[in-house]
Structures are given as C-alpha cells and as structure tokens.
Amino acid sequence: MISCKNLCVLRQLPLKNCRRHYSAIQSSAALLSVRPTKWTPKPAAAGGAVSAWQQRTTAKQHQQQQRRSLFSSSRMQAKDYYATLGVAKNANAKDIKKAYYELAKKYHPDTNKDDPDASKKFQDVSEAYEVLSDDQKRREYDTYGQTTENMNRQGAGGAGGFGGGPFGPDGFSQNWQFRSTIDPEELFRKIFGEGNFRSNSFDDFADSKFGFGQAQELVMDLTFAQAARGVNKDVNVNVVDQCPKCAGSKCEPGTKPGRCQYCNGTGFETISTGPFVMRSTCRYCQGTRQYIKYPCAECEGKGQTVQRRKVTVPVPAGIENGQTVRMQVGSKELFVTFRVERSDYFRRDGADVHTDAPISLAQAVLGGTVRVQGVYEDQWLNIEPGTSSHRKIALRGKGLKRVNAHGHGDHYVHIKIEVPKKLSQEQRALLEAYAELEEDTPGQIHGMAQRKDGSKKATAGASETKTDAQPAGRTADSGSQGTSRAGAETESAKGQQSEKSETRRKDQQTGGESGSGGGFLNKIKSMFN
C-alpha cells in the first residue's frame, strides 16, 4: 500500500482531512502520470462541522468552473467591430471613417423606413466607429476586447489584484456590453447636416470633434487678382489645442493628480488569466504613473479640446492653383491648399501671363500705341507700322511674382487686328481707291476689274453694297434702290475713267516724284469733288 501522505506529496495535493487510500496494485508511474480529474475531500460525518478549509476549497472550485464558462461565453459574444465596418484590423483612420461614412448613410432609419433592422444596424455601426476612431479605445479593444471605460463599470477586483480587470468583483468574467457616449443621431447630423445630405459633408465631418478632431487640411478659393497680388484671408477652423480651463493639467482647477493606485506609480500592471501572466502598460494612467481623481469637466481629463478659431491665412503673391502652404495654428499644423479661379482676360503659364490686344486696321498699317491691362498696372504698348495680326510682344518683368524665386515673369501681348464689318460710303471709297493702287495683290479683289496694262479699276457694282455689308438676299424695295444707285455710280465712273488714266500717266512720267501716294490723293480728291 502507498500511504495517502506520500501520494499527496507526490501529486501536490492537500493533506488535511484526507481519508483516501490507494491500492499497491496500481503502478506508481501511472499514478504520477495521470492526475485525477477531480479531487474532493471526504465529507464529514453526519452532524459534524465543515472545516473552513473545506469551504474555501469548494468555493474556489465553483469559481473556477464559473470563470471558464462565463469567460468563454464573453469571448464568443464579443462584437467584431472591424467586421461591422467591413475593414481590416490594420486599417488606418481614413479607411475607418470612409467605411462609417458609407454605412451610416446606408443604414440610417430615415432612409430605410421599410427595414425593421436598420435602426439596430445603424447603432452597431455607430458603436464600432466610436471605438475604432479613438486611438486609445482601439488599442484597448485590440488588447483586451473592451475599453477602459467599460472595464471601470465592471467594478473593483479581478486579475492581478487590481480593480477593473477582466473579471468582476467575485472573480467571474463579465460579458462586456457597449455603452456609447455619443448619440448616433447627433453623430449622423454632424456628418450630413440637418435634414439633407450635403455634398461637402465629409469635409465638415473631418473637421468636427467626431472626426480626427484636428483641422489638418483646408481648401481656400481665390480669385485671379487675389492670387496675383496676394491677400490675407480669415477662415474658421477646428483645431485641437490646450484646454483653456485646466491649461493642459487634465485636473479640475485647484486639484492635482496623485499617484496611480492601480499600478502603484510604476506605470505597468500585471494581469493573470489562468496560467498566463502578462505585463503591460497600465490601462488607467497609460504609463504616466499618475491618477486623476477629479478630471477636468471641460476636456474630460484629456488636457486638450477641439476649439473653433479664426485664423488669418497670408496668401503669398503669385500663388498657383493647387499649391499648398503650411502654417502653425496653436500646437498643430494647418495645411492650406489654394484653388484659383480662371481669369477671363489673363491666361497664365507659371509666372508668365498672356493677353490679347485688339487694334484697328489703321493702327496695324500706320502704327500707333494701345493701352493694355497689366497684372499690377496698365501698360502702354507701342505698335510699329505694318504690324501683322497674332504678333506677340513681350513686356519683360511685367508678369506674376515668382513664389519660390526672385523677380517676376513676363507679360506677352498677342496683337489682334479687328477688321471692320460695317463701312461708311467714304471709308469704302477710300479702300477702293487704295485697292486700285495696290500692285502686289495676291488673287483678285471683289468689285475690282483688271486692265490690260495690269492696273485695276472699280466695276459698276463695286460701291452699290450698303455700308452695313447687307447680304445679297434683299427685299424687292432694297434691290430697286440699289439698282438705281448702281446706275448713277456707273455713269460717274465712266466720266472719271479718262481722268484716272491721265493721272496715272502723269505719275509715271514724273518718275514717282510724289510717289504712288500722289495719285492716291488725287483719286480721293476727285471722288469728293
């Protein structure tokens, strides 16, 4: 026989009140390799008193059984917030917010009145976003399957001897039920506005306290003149800055933080879950070793709040469309991207600008000056005689200011000759006279006949067209008036034909002393005499 005492020593079993005996036939090796699945002390005799050790042993076994069952059911019933939002566990904050943005619109009760489960789905999506959008809550959820706020609700006691552990006051695991601190409807209104889905609601949501809590980017609209000359513009942005009430101390004014009572000021805690022991950063002080008994009511003990501020953004002169500048706002950085409107007059090419300058036919032939609008001031442009259309004239240094370099760009002016569409009788007569004197005309001119000697003369119907360049399809009355006028002009042209020939012969004989212009002036004088 193996004594009960030796058997208990080998198996590390308690000796007190042990009355069990084992047969020597059983192999000692088998006894050492197979431990009884359940050991219970021999009950006391009827009417006998139960010892304190027996009571503690029975209670401990009961607690272990309850702990296994409840802890397993808690894990099985825990919600997978990543699956709720349809994102991966390594998804960044932008992907999480985008997923919530789409699902919130999809499952909102106002847009799914026929779906009885829409309200429940909308609540689940809001719960998942509230936890995963907060870095601290997400870290705690990934580690423990719940957050500190919910663990605090479970009461003191539990693993490691610290309150708020994964087990309740009796050492039993409790199933975590989410308790949102933000109304899902309020969160939805912050995103989409009141009563409608705005096109820019997602941008507003990013600047709200339910988004990232920080105005990281801002798009500013500018006119061309504002971008060219520079301007200071005031904008309202949401920034995360030091709490004005507690000045960043996280405590109510007049109070101070004390040593963390959960980690004893070490910043770490030890959590025991069955046979496993884990040492990690304290969940209550986050490694700061301090415990805030009276947290600030304004910032809820975070030391920072989302504040609406009016910020003056200095727009540099010459800024281009799509450029981004960085500026400091409190303790954070604000990135401002500029969106410059197109100008109806200026065409921009970097620091250079291009404009069109219309000039008359006389200015193009004889030369002159024209006033053009510049970027910063008007400029007088000199037109040389014989300037052709689409000629490009450069005004050096009159363009836009270079943002990242010294100096200015150039202003290029493109000449546009405006041909008159309506001519008076005198203007048409002058042009016909000039056409007769023109010698290098490519092709033919309407209303001009070619002589044998190479000269040109106006035909009978050359001047019959009205000064407003009326088309050929006229009414009967206008046609009759044009016919009578054409007959009169034909007789006048015949009477002047001999005079034209004589004038041309005199010009040729004089060797061009007065130039072709002399014959041209005589022609004009004869037409108006």
UniProtKB/Swiss-Prot annotation:
Annotated Zn(2+) 2 binding lies at C260, C263, C282, C285
Q: Which residues carry this modification: N6-acetyllysine?
A: K121
Where do the J domain residues begin and end? 80-145
Specify residue ranges for compositional bias: Basic and acidic residues: 497-508
- GO CC annotation, single: cytosol
Ligand binding (Zn(2+) 1): C243, C246, C296, C299
Q: Which domain of life is it from?
A: Eukaryota
- Biological process GO terms, please? mitochondrion organization; negative regulation of apoptotic process; negative regulation of smoothened signaling pathway; protein folding; response to heat
Q: Which Pfam families match?
A: DnaJ, DnaJ_C, DnaJ_CXXCXGXG
Q: Where is the transit peptide?
A: 1-22
Q: Which UniProt keywords apply?
A: Acetylation, Chaperone, Developmental protein, Membrane, Metal-binding, Methylation, Mitochondrion, Mitochondrion outer membrane, Repeat, Transit peptide, Zinc, Zinc-finger
Which GO molecular function entries does the Swiss-Prot or TrEMBL record give? ATP binding; heat shock protein binding; patched binding; unfolded protein binding; zinc ion binding
Instruction: State whether keyword Acetylation applies.
Output: yes
Residue ranges of the region described as Disordered: 441-529
Places the protein is found: Mitochondrion outer membrane
Which regions does the record annotate with the repeat CXXCXGXG motif? 243-250, 260-267, 282-289, 296-303
Q: Where are the zinc fingers (CR-type)?
A: 230-308
**PANTHER family named among the record's database cross-references:** DNAJ HOMOLOG SUBFAMILY A MEMBER 3, MITOCHONDRIAL
What function does the entry list? May act as a tumor suppressor in larval imaginal disks.
This protein's name: DnaJ homolog l(2)tid, mitochondrial
